Amino acid sequence: MNTLEAIYQRRSVKAYDPNYQITPEEEQKLLEATIQAPTSFNIQHWRFVILRDPELRQKIRKEFGNDQAQMTDASLLILFTADTKAWQKEPYRYWQNAPQEVADLLVNWMGPFHQGREWLQRDEAQRSIGMAMQTLMLAAKAMGYDSCPMIGFDIDKVAELINLPDDYVMGPMVAIGKKVKEPWPKPGQLPLSDLVVENTFSRKD
């Protein structure tokens, strides 16, 4: 399956085979593909919480997740979080394979870009989560699996359950597995004419 096929065939699947297990090798392959996603300054803010404990998944589903079946039935349930302060934690490790002059340049830019801009740090973390999520879902599709991004859960309660560290932000979950029911037909995309702007927006006088 090529990239365009994965993009067009990816759907948000709700019903999964609860008995199907993704192998450890496949899980590793999915995660290694996910971390190929781009991040600003190559900071790689994401931290992936693999929700593997059946009791924990059941608790999230029943108490904080609106009883969404994919939370317990999918082979994998991954909660995306990100470290908003990753930019200041051993920054040279993000450029360990780059020429020294390149690493020096980027690391010296990194501090002033983020320093004192809490809103930007949070935005960058969430942007990184979004790109990693899409990478994961496309990789899953290419490997013959389906996925579902989910934000319909009590973020604060789940953050407590997983002991979310200070300075981390919560993102959505992604369920991955073998579907047992076809999703609804695609609801339809807006026409490009509604979405694409050439150069500038029109002024409204």
Name each model feature, range by range.
Residues 1-205:
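Acidic, surface-exposed loops and disordered segments
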